[in-house]
């Protein structure tokens, strides 16, 4: 992808002051103990500034979504425009009392950190761990809509959806019921690939879909793998097997073909075409296979008994919830730095009914969420204004 110089103009949001978390994975906002600090120590709903921040970076891909931002430059935009559920201090340690704030020392100076929520972590006698989350009740998104726990739950379910293929890995945590929720659905691409090219059972997909998939593999998929082989052979590899091994895919047969190599890549990435793009030696996979087939990897298909919710995610109030893991996880608390994305913008409010296991979209269909990839909306310090090649 071309790395052309792009510009982002971000107008300051009136929703929150800088004492609130700036975005996913960012440090909690703070105020120093010294009078020279420029950070505010109290949260308010007044405008932070009437200025405009212009970002000029070379790595923008235009995926300014809290769910699908991939490049570091795109993530910079997310950090500025989104609220994080939890934040961290200057040492990277989590802030669990963000509502009232926590004071911590760093290099001889005391800093008080504020955030969007409090989190109490309890290790239970049965080995499970419960995270009691209490959200502030005075937060607003940049369009003036209130931030509630429903926005948090919606965001979690997007990250945990079986067809989610973004960079956030919350789906790998031991949340109670998550494995059952995800395993009750598979992607169309994975089902067809695992069935094999000679399959005759069309219970979960049509014969036409199967043919389209394997036609794409035999054409664009082979070309994708062959580009890697050509690159590796120009750098010392002698055949497909040695090229694949040099690329990190050991174990292919001595007489392996480019198709065998592509199948190994697909298996490695659970047949997520967007994830497989990481192995490109030149062309994007999306340029080599038909758009409708590419979408197979984000098309959910129910398999077995459908599981409608994640048992470990429980709403307890308009601004509170609990999340329970089956065991102590060193990464779970860091996953809670997730962005709180507005349900009313990224989801479908008519499809949100917590009591009836509906969470703002149809399970296995994130098309509505994906459609809002280029223009972010959140509750961070800035609102997104414009993205173009020139200076705004």
Language-model region placement:
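Bacterial Sec-dependent N-terminal signal peptides
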Residues: 1-11
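Hydrophobic core
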Residues: 16-20
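Bacterial lipoprotein signal-peptidase II cleavage site
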Residues: 21-34
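N-terminal low-complexity, Pro/Thr/Ser-rich intrinsically disordered segments
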Residues: 34-55
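Short, well-ordered beta-strand elements
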Residues: 49-59, 129-134, 152-155, 320-323, ...
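N-terminal lobe/hinge region of extracytoplasmic solute-binding protein
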Residues: 56-126, 377
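Gly/Pro-rich hinge or "lid" segments in bacterial periplasmic/extracellular proteins
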Residues: 90-93, 274, 278-310, 318, ...
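Aromatic- and charge-enriched surface segment that lines or borders ligand/interaction sites
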Residues: 117-282, 322
């Amino acid at each position: 992808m071309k790395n052309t110089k792009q510009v982002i103009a971000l107008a300051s949001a009136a929703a929150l002051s800088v004492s609130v978390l700036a975005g996913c994975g960012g440090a909690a906002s703070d105020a120093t103990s010294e009078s020279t600090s420029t950070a505010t120590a109290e949260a308010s709903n007044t405008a932070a500034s009437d200025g405009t921040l212009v970002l000029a970076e070379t790595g923008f891909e235009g995926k300014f979504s809290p769910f699908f931002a991939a490049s570091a430059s795109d993530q910079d935009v997310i950090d500025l425009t989104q609220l994080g559920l939890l934040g961290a201090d200057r040492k990277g340690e989590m802030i669990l009392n963000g509502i009232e704030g926590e004071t911590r020392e760093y290099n001889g100076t005391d800093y008080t950190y504020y955030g969007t929520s409090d989190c109490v972590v309890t290790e239970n006698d049965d080995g499970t761990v419960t995270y009691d989350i209490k959200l502030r009740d005075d937060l607003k998104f940049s369009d003036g809509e209130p931030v509630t726990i429903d926005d948090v739950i919606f965001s979690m379910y997007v990250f945990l959806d079986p067809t989610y293929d973004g960079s956030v890995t919350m789906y790998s945590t031991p949340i109670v019921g998550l494995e059952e929720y995800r395993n009750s659905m598979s992607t169309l691409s994975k089902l067809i690939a695992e069935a094999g090219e000679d399959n005759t059972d069309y219970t979960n997909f049509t014969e036409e879909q199967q043919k389209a998939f394997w036609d794409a593999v035999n054409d664009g998929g082979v070309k994708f793998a062959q580009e890697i082989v050509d690159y590796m052979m120009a750098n010392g590899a002698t055949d497909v097997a040695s090229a694949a091994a040099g690329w990190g895919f050991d174990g292919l047969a001595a007489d392996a073909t480019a198709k065998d190599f592509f199948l190994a890549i697909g298996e490695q990435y659970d047949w997520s075409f967007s994830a497989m793009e990481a192995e490109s030696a030149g062309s994007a996979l999306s340029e080599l296979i038909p758009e409708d087939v590419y979408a197979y990897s984000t098309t959910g298909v129910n398999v077995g008994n459908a599981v409608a919710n994640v048992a470990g995610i429980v709403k307890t109030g308009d601004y509170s919830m609990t999340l329970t893991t089956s065991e102590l996880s060193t990464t779970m608390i860091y996953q809670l730095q997730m962005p709180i994305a507005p349900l009313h913008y990224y989801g479908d409010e008519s499809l949100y009914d917590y009591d009836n296991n509906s969470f703002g979209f149809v399970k296995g269909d994130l098309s509505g969420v994906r459609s809002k990839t280029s223009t972010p909306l959140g509750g961070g310090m800035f609102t997104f204004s414009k993205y173009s090649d020139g200076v705004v």
